[in-house]
Amino acid sequence: MDVLSVSEINAQIKALLEATFLQVRVQGEVSNLTIHKVSGHAYFSLKDSQSVIRCVLFKGNANRLKFALKEGQEMVVFGGISVYVPRGDYQINCFEIEPKEIGSLTLALEQLKEKLRLKGYFDKENKLPKPHFPKRVAVITSQNSAAWADMQKIASKRWPICELVCINTLMQGEGCVQSVVESIAYADSFHDTRNAFDAIVVARGGGSMEDLYSFNDEKIADALYLAKTFSMSAIGHESDFLLSDLVADLRASTPSNAMEILLPSSDEWLQRLDGFNVKLHRSFKILLHQKKAHLEHLADFLKRLSFENKHHLNALKLEQLKIALENKTLEFLRFKKTLLEKISTQALTSPFLQTKTERLNRLENALKLAHANLKLPQFGAFLSKNNQAIELEALKAGDKIELSNEKARASAEILSVDRV
């Protein structure tokens, strides 16, 4: 048996293994994952409960993965055995990698959903409210599609005053994602302008999952989330549920259903308005009756208030005049009394003083009459006897009296007096 060098035996092993295991499919759990930022190559191990094998995924193949490779994932790798002669190491050179039990597209979608969920794309608080009465709606679809025709038909019946604007868009195949993203951005560019759209509806009819899968793309999700205009996703049929349905502000099961959800029914609103009119008329009549009664009550109150207030003011003025006159009278009498006390006893018999005394008595009687005048009722008269004021209760039968007021004077004789 020939003696081989280390290099020779490794070279023979390389030739044998690479020829024998040209294509293999191996299942295991991903561990020790390292992705080189510069080269883009991924290095990892695939293990089961008893053994481990190293793997490499070069950049070209890594770029074709639709999902992110992570530690702990159960994967099936497809590739060939390669041997590194200088170290005698062997590994699987991976051409493709698929998740165990589920497809790579499904895993990629689940990973994208989780990513967007963490960014808040599905949160209710980030959803815009549906407009109540849309006047202008942008429909992102193919202008030759049955979906567009159905949407126009339903809109014209439900809410004919709404203007539907079709933004012709490629809705499947290569270039679909970019076309949809550009159409969303175009419709949203009118936000806060005179020609702004009240809603953006992304719509297309049913199809295979391959036809609809473009609407699971992250770029479309970003465009819907970042739009400042209310958005709806109406892709496929009721059973089709896509990423755009989760990100849009509202989902409709079909394009036709989108119009039924978005647009109010004019017939229903006409019936409501009729009902509102009846209720408003009834409420107005009740309110008018209440206000009329209130005004009548207020008018009566103001009349009473005006009379009572005027009477109160007049009485107050009269009382003030009475008090003022009494004060002046007392002051005058005190003055005269003081003056008389200063006159000597001899002067009391003088004709001059007698004249003044008589004048003072007349003045006192006049003041009493004036004082009585303050108490005179509205239709009464002054009562005097011998030019002196006298109280009614002081009269007796046969007295001759004078009655006077501002307008007239009269003489009378008392026939009888009844004491109360």
From Swiss-Prot:
InterPro entries: Exonuc_VII_L (IPR003753), Exonuc_VII_lsu_C (IPR020579), OB-fold_nuc-bd_dom (IPR025824). Its EC number is 3.1.11.6. It is found in: Cytoplasm. It catalyses: Exonucleolytic cleavage in either 5'- to 3'- or 3'- to 5'-direction to yield nucleoside 5'-phosphates. Gene3D superfamilies: 2.40.50.1010. Keywords: Cytoplasm, Exonuclease, Hydrolase, Nuclease. GO terms for biological process: DNA catabolic process. Disulfide bonds: none annotated. GO terms for cellular component: cytoplasm; exodeoxyribonuclease VII complex. One of its GO terms (molecular function) is exodeoxyribonuclease VII activity. It is an enzyme of class 3 (hydrolase). It comes from the Bacteria. HAMAP family: Exonuc_7_L. Heterooligomer composed of large and small subunits. Bidirectionally degrades single-stranded DNA into large acid-insoluble oligonucleotides, which are then degraded further into small acid-soluble oligonucleotides. Belongs to the XseA family. This is Exodeoxyribonuclease 7 large subunit.
